[in-house]
Each structure stands twice: as structure tokens, then as C-alpha cells.
Amino acid sequence: LNAHRNVFPVDPVERGFTWALKSAGDLLEVRETLNEKGLSLADVARLLEHSEMEPERWRDLASIERHCVIATEERGFSDWQATRRRAAAFGKPPAGITRVVMAGVLDPSSLAVEALQHWSRLLPVEVLVYAPEATHRDAFDLWGRPVAETWLTRPIDIPTPETTIHQGGTPAEQAEAAVELLAPYDDPGAVAAIGVADVEITAPLEKALAAREIGAFDPAGRRMGTHGVFHLLRIVSQLAATRSFRAVAEFIRCPDVAETIRRRVEAQTGEKPSLRQLLDDLDTLAVTSLPDTLDDALELAPRVFSDPKKTSAVPAGLAWIDSVLKSLAAPDFGTALTEFLGEVFAARRFRSDNPQDAVFAAIADQVSEVLDALDGPAAHLFPGGLDPAHRLELLLLALGDQIFYPERQARDIDLQGWLELLWEDAPHLIITGMNDGKAPEAIIGHTFLPDSARRALGLRNNDTRFARDACLMTTLIESRRHNGGRVDFIFGRTGSAEEPLRPSRLLFQCADADLPARTLHFFNKPPRRADPMPWQLAWRLRPQPLLDDNSVFHKLRVTQFRDYLQCPFRFYLRHGLRMSEIDATRTEMDAMEFGSLLHGVLETFAQDPDAVVLTDPEKIRAAFHAILDRRLHGIYGARLTVPVTIQRESARQRLGWWAEKEAEQRLQGWHIIAAETRISPEDDPWTLAGMTINGTVDRVERHAQLGVRLIDFKTRSAFDVQKKMRKTVENYHLTPLKRGEEPESHPAWSLVTSSDGTTARWADLQLPLYRLAMERRFPGEKITTAHVTLSKTKPEIGLDEWSGLDGPLLDSARACAEGVIASIRDRAFWPPAEKLPYGDDFGALFFGEPLEAVDPGLLVPGASPE
């Protein structure tokens, strides 16, 4: 690159195969454009040597071209651009050709003209132009090309422009306008055709036609890049290049791939897993172990799916994917890829009379041709050879622009490109996308060949393109003027990315006297295709009543009380229906998983008899860190991802800060006597109002004089942003009534008097329930409760006791818990809280209006499930 700094002034971020392929493609495109005029990069460097058009850069480009041509010829190949130039200058017509007729070609390349001029010395060459000779003799050159100077100023006579020029605000509205013009016809395909000057209109146009049961056919065919096989190969390419788990998940979600995995598992075990179970297990692996690569997934899947009673297809699927990638890395790449595609599509049944199957066959032929080329001699000339990722990248590059041709149905309407409209003979022509830059096509800001350089070199430029398109538009109009035909033009106001668009200059190419009226017509607002309707829900959700054997009627966890107090309906969704949102794309632990990680470290520490007696903060810190690393690698594998590594450092920091406090508690006489203590052992469950209450106390400590302390560890912030002070444990459990909020609006059992004498309501019962449950474990002993905050800043790290949790306050907590239990048994799950204090996992279901989005009819007591 240092030798060609005028072309590559800055080194690429990553100078790899992808960068080289794109750069080579850009330079080949420039050579192709120049070759239309019969020019090489060396020719351009010579022509622009004394110009102000970056001659230094053209010299560097010529140097690159020279090195490439030499390397090509040294390997026994010929430069195909030079071959084309020689053929144009010296070639002879094929045997048997005695006459050449060029009919209606408005824009032949200069190289083609040079070839025909050379042939004209050997045989007759005729040029046919569709135009009246009397008035347009001087509007074309000898080769039928429109003369730019003439067409730049020649008016285009659009019949009744006030009724034949239409506008649509967006591509979809342009499509609707086009389809409305077809409404009078019983068989639109027999009398009308649609022109598409802007490819952005194609998809909405096909959709609008399909909605009216009108088939669409594009004679230019479809790019291979739009087909499902290309999508599959693109994912395989990503897998080969990165082995990322994101690509693995996308790959398995391809229907044919998922079917292949299920089929293979059936062959191995005799039982075919369901598609739902396969995808559920894939999500489970993603959220449980956060694998970053296929190798991570291969290591972690056996741990996640270790239960012999619950088999999973995921480990077998991952092993198959790994074997596919290894086979692609073998010497016979083409055979391996063909066998892979054969296995993936083996379950499909192809029929010769099915148009979609015929397309598949054509695509298979194209894939085979490209694979043959990749196994050819040129592929072996790459330095260091081509690995599977490089071969797949080349395959995609070669296939992406290949064309396949679906079968045209009898009543389909044609969707012609702008330049193909010259050959369309439908009486009624509807042309969409009539915007500047599309018709006429414009060259704006080309990296190597801006419009000024094209003019200087005699290449196609904006003026010649305008002349070509003005002539084409005139031809479309005049060929229908006298035979009852019609041409409608539709332009847009905005593109698919909401960028503003201008009407085509061709639509302004009228007499000066008509220009004001034409301009005013363009400024009219586009007619509404449909009256806008206010947004409303399409339907209301109808939640079903819970069955009597649902677990929430028989046992509750202490944390579930908080969920019910927060919102009864969301409690019903989360715990009654067991609904939860899963983000299988996340790459780091969520708040709950991070908290569980720290809880696990502290539990393991508390169960080590040697660790619990430590009083040296450094030794405690070292013990915490060692346990943390063991747990992390046990869950997420030997290689931690970057996001998890960052979270690991956060965990180490928090535990390191707590180690100092932990040492202080030992020195103060608090000794750990239990960790992760269940308040309801299976052989002796704790019940309240006849309901079994489950829960786990994070830690139990004892002091010789102060009694027993129940600790719950929290990883959230202990700082109250509004009050600008540290939250007390009471603040987490009680919520003061808001200004204007009447106590009567809440059940009496939920109300309580806080420590400052104000009326509040219970928001959480976790520590009070722990206290009540553990009284039977430590009868007659003094019991206190506390929060330990393991937050992300050192000042927030600490232990906060709830010294006032006793007497009337504890009695109120018991009454509240009994009230919640009674309400759940009465199926009081309605109405919902309209707004939660933080984070709503079900907000997307309600569109911000839970009372409107849900029909609670079946939730009322006495309703029975359907």
C-alpha cells in the first residue's frame, strides 16, 4: 500500500480477504466503465496527466493495473479487458453473418460502436431509429445515439399531464397508485404493463398486486441474492469465517436445517424431537451459558443438557454443524458443499411442474458452475490458498448477481425496468419511480469517476444519460399517442429510508408556457389512498382462569408476595401462567444471573469451615475470587467472553470490597452458622393461613450477646436518587402513599404505619416472612434481619439491619401476607397496576394500556376455563 498512497491514503482497519475482495471489485468496476470507451487505466493516466483531476492517483491506478496484467500473463492467462479492446479493433464477424441490424439501441457503448464500425468494412451494418426523420434527423448521431445538446432542451409532450402525472408519498403509496390505475381492467396483464424506474418500488408493488390477486412478473429475472438458498449459504459463510454462536443460532433456525437436525436425531435415537423443543433448548443454551462461539457451545451443551431423563437434540445438532465445517475445510470443498446442500434439502419433494421447484433446479445448476470455477486453476493462484470462508465468500460474490427466471403465469402483469420499456408493447403503460436520480439516472460523487471526469474522457455522463432517457420517454409516449394507448407517470415524495425525493426533471421538460401550471401540479398534496384510521387494538387478550391444581393456590415463594403486591395481574401472568420473556441474543448476564453468581460465591464461602473463621480481609478476598472463578468457568466454560469477563471484574471488585466488611463482622463477634437455609424443608414445611411458604435465607449468623441475624444479599443500588440518601431496609419493604392517594384505595391488610408515623403500604414481605418462619427454628432467641448491599460503588457496600421489624410491624406483615394468600385463593388478579416503579416485562403485551388491552371476563371469580 505504501507504493500507492494516492489510492490508499489510509491503511484499512483490517487488511484481510474481505477488504482485498471489495477493493479489487471497486477497481475492476472502474476498469469496466473505462473499457466501454476502449480505455485502460494507463490510457486515462496519460490523458489526465496535465489536468486537475488527480493525475497522481491515476498514475498509481495505472501502476496497479500494470502489475496485475503482468501477474495475469505470467500465469498463462489473458487480460479480458485488453482482449475485448483487441476484438473491437481487429475482430471479424462470426462465420455465416452477412448483415448486422442495430434496432432501437439508444445507448450502445463506444467499444460496441468501434466493433461495428470495424465490421462495416466487411459487411452491411444498418442502424434503425424509432423517430420521424423529418423532425428528428439531427437528434441522433450515425449510431442512433441521442444527441445530448438537442435532447437537453427538446420539450417532451405529455398528453393531459394533469391526469397522467401522479404522486405517491412513499414507495408503498406509489405502488397503490399504480394498482389503482389497473382497477378498470378485468385482465390487467393483457392490456397494461408497469415500469419500475426505482427498484425500491418493486417489493411494495408486488405486495399491492398480490393483495388484489394480480400476479407480477419481472422479465429481467430475480437476483440469486434474494433466494433462500443464498441466505443459507450466507449463514454458512459466516459460520466458516467466525464460528460465532449467533451464526449457529441463525443457522439452526433455517427451516430445512432444523428439519435435518431432527431427522438425524431420529435416525440415531428412533425418536424425532419436536421443532419447538429444539428451538426452546437452543434458547436455553443461549441464556444459560452465553456461548460466544460454536466451540463454547460444544463444550457447554453437555453440561446444560446433562439430565438423562430429558434428552435434547441440541448437542447432536452442534456436533453435526461442526462436522459440516470440518468437511468444508477438507481439500474437496465443492463435493463437501454439494453433499451438505443435498442433505439439507433431502426431505423436500421436487416436482417438474412446480415453478418454485424449477427455480431450485436452475439455482442448483448455477451453484455447480461457480463451484467448478472455484476448483479451477485460477483458484489455486491465491497466495496461501483459499480457506472455506474465502471460498464461500467468493461463491456468494459470484452468485449474488446471478439471475434466475421464475415461470411467467398466464395472467401476470409485467414489471419492466426503465431501459426495457422501449420494447414493451402494452397499450397502457404505468411508470413508477419517476424521480431525479432514477429517471434520468444520475452519477453523483463517484469515488474514481465523477461526472466531470467522465465528460473529459468521453464516457457516459449525466447529459448523455438525460438525453437517452428523454428520448426513451418521448418514444414511450409517441408510440401510444395515436393507437388509443396511454402512459401514466408516478413520482414519490420520500424513499424507503424517508429521504426526500425530487420529481424527475423529465417531467419538467415542457414548453415554458406550461411550466408554471406543471410546477403547481407537483406541489399539490398527494391524494390519500385510504382514510387514516385512529390506532386501535386489533383484539383484546382473553386470559384463561387458572386450574385449581395450579401451584399458586398451594404454595408460594416469599418473593412472589412482592410480585402480587406490585400487580396482581402480572403475578397471574408470571407465576400462574409461567410467562417470561427470553432474550436469546444477549451476551452478558442479566441482573438476576449476576446476583445469583454472587449469591453462589457467598454460599460456597459460608459452607467452608476454614473460610468462615477468617478475619484477614486479604485472605477472605482471595477466597471469594477463587470461588468466583470456579463458578464462572463451571457455568460459562474455559474461555469467558468479553462481556462476561467485564462482569467478572465487577464481581471481583464488589466481593473485594465486601471482604473488608466481612472481616469486620467476624471481629465484632458475628459467626456464620448456615447459608442458603430453606424456611420450608420438605419434611417440615412452614405454612401460613394454610399455604406452604417457600424461601431461602441467604445467610444465618449468630452473636453471643446479640442473637441470630438473617441476611439477604442484594446487588442493586442502595442509593435513593430522589431523596439523595441511602435507602433503609424498611424503604425496600414499605412504599409511602403518594400525594392525593387515599388509603381506602388499597386493601386494609396492605396498609401499615411506617417508622416515621406516616401511612404506607407493604411492597415486599421478604424479610418479615423470613423472620416469622425462622422463629420456630430459633424459639425464644432474639432475631434481627438485615440487607447486605453488594452494589457497584464502594460507598454503597454495607450491611443495614432492620431493627424495628418487631411487634406491631411484624403483625402487620403477617396480616398482609394472609391477605395476599386470601386474595390469590379468591382469584383476585384484576385490575392491573397501570404503571410499575421499574421494569415491566409484560409492557409489550399491553401497548401502554393494560386496561384496554385485556378482557378480564374469564378472570373473575366463578369463571371456568374453556
Say what each PLM segment does.
Residues L1-V612, H625, D629-A638, I646-E649, ...:
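Polyanion-engaging groove/track-forming segments
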